[in-house]
């Protein structure tokens, strides 16, 4: 079973061609909202009030850089929370006090610029991380931000020299020994736009997804990930020939990109070119015999067939190889509950809660656990 995949980052691969020939504006209606990456660092009135009030006071007490770092820390003034549920600009991240790593980096950079610090961005190589949303499967990248060296600021009545300090919203243990690569700010903006395209796709907003990914490509034509996203957008829109062109562009620069290969195989199958699609499927099976969500999809199929024991075994395989992904624990809990193994199901639900990274998932799993515990107490 082939799945539609989006990738978040390919920092080491640069596209060396003009993206406009791949675009097809006339095929799509106007977007339902403004599509603009130029203002993602803009401070809202609430952010400006924070800079001039609470942050000003903290900086005068602790210094420019240390004041901001402490405000952003886990137990700091802002009390930020990691939430993988969506990508936000600086203002929305500040308002919600939460966001994914890219959203939190954008907000941090906005504050740093406002108080006179320079910023530098890094793409960090982490172990492959996957998620799914709305029938779309995502390969998740990671970025962080470094607050600059030898920058002075008189705004707060200080003349201060600071050293580079990297702000990262993953636990230190998750980053130990990982390599990073400097990326320009235009890449951060393109990542934001590409993420918004993927989120629009997952929500069924194919038209808006096109305009988001178009903006990403024009913002940073060298960034490979949006070309793959564009292929998925075209396929969802029924523009199969355009989808093939976009995906073959990805493969021109990364011939063994598993996500683009999988997406292209789906497109070729849709076009009725089964021999070509099967050749790609054989190549994919050689590159990765059991790709991400391989056992998961089989587990869902077993549940639909009311074969709970088989579903349990498939979900257990996914938990064994990727125990930090919440959905595997949740669906294993479903299969176990269907089999009457309530204690084991409760244990898996607790693990789903512990590993969830989105507020909506956390609320769902907590409600399921409460219901399961209530049913147990009733009996």
Regions found by a protein language model. Name each.
Residues 85-227, 241-253:
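Long, contiguous interaction/recruitment modules in multidomain scaffold/adaptor proteins
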Residues 195, 229, 263, 296-297, ...:
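Canonical tetratricopeptide repeat
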Residues 215-216, 249-250, 281-284, 317-318, ...:
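Canonical positions in the second alpha-helix
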Residues 30-93:
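Secondary-structure boundary elements
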